[in-house]
Amino acid sequence: MPRKGQVERRDVMADPIYNSKLVTRLINRLMLDGKKGTAQQILYKAFEAIAERSGRDAMEVFEEAMNNIMPVLEVKARRVGGANYQVPVEVRPERRTTLALRYLVNYSRLRNEKTMDARLANEIMDAANNTGASVKKREDMHKMAEANKAFAHYRW
């Protein structure tokens, strides 16, 4: 923990093409080894593929997918009297988007399509249709929170 108080959060610049901070954050999550240009190309190709296949605006599909991936509840480990309890807690809005982006990129990387832009496009489209691995991850988190609802009074 820093001694000089709370660290100020840096604001990301909005994406020049889609004019969205969420898109910039997705590009930053996609980026490997500082290669931002490559990450941008992957995302823009994926968005083109989404627009072509769905016949809708890619940003619309992406925002719908994000809403389907964002978790509302999660569990945190809390130690009480020598036992660890999985305590369900509500997820803050900023963390919701962070987790959703993380799940989207991680499960896109695990897919079997040939190129990363195809993987990302398919995962976004699956998420928009409430299917796909990233949506399943969210459902699993909610199931865990529901199963441990009895420990909700240990919340802090």
Curated annotation (Swiss-Prot):
PROSITE patterns: RIBOSOMAL_S7. It comes from the Bacteria. GO terms for biological process: translation. The keyword Zinc does not apply. Pfam families: Ribosomal_S7. Part of the 30S ribosomal subunit. Contacts proteins S9 and S11. One of the primary rRNA binding proteins, it binds directly to 16S rRNA where it nucleates assembly of the head domain of the 30S subunit. Is located at the subunit interface close to the decoding center, probably blocks exit of the E-site tRNA. Belongs to the universal ribosomal protein uS7 family. This is Small ribosomal subunit protein uS7. It comes from Exiguobacterium sibiricum (strain DSM 17290 / CCUG 55495 / CIP 109462 / JCM 13490 / 255-15). The lineage of its organism: Bacteria, Bacillati, Bacillota, Bacilli, Bacillales.
